[in-house]
Amino acid sequence: MQTKVMTAKEAINSYVKNGDCLAIGGFVTNRRPYALVREIIRQHIGNLYIEGGPSGGDIDMLIGAGLVTAINTAYISNAAFSMVCRRYGEAVVQHKILNEDYSMDVQTIAYHGAALGLPYVPVKNMLGSDLADKWGISAEERKKHDKLPNQKFILQEDPFTPGSMLCLVPTPKI
């Protein structure tokens, strides 16, 4: 049997390409793939679409290197040093990256739905929230990027409970 063991340089060179959508795991400062992120930066692989739950300094490094086009995250912080990662905060305020924002629980449910092969997941906890109505990537901007879903969510009546609404959230295509 052939070994699959390889260096970070070989792995990134083989599996990460410009314009890829990357899901980066871990929680803020724990279990983050810093060595792989540094290798992405060394190889200058850009135009990345990042999916990350509660994210940390590794994604901030990619943003600082100018390699991120869009990010979908619930939270990004260097917990020991700041409430919000510096480069991420600057990039969002200066409109240098597209920023989609879901709550941590909705994002986790969406990842689970993606793992199950579902195109979307129904949730209730975004109903009436500013996350649903005011925050996120505009419809006009979404049309320019084939890696982004056409809409942040769709409101639909619950087919099992007439009169009750659901928020249909797209799952990431990773």
Model-identified regions with their sequence ranges:
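Conserved alpha/beta enzyme-core scaffold
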Residues: 1-174
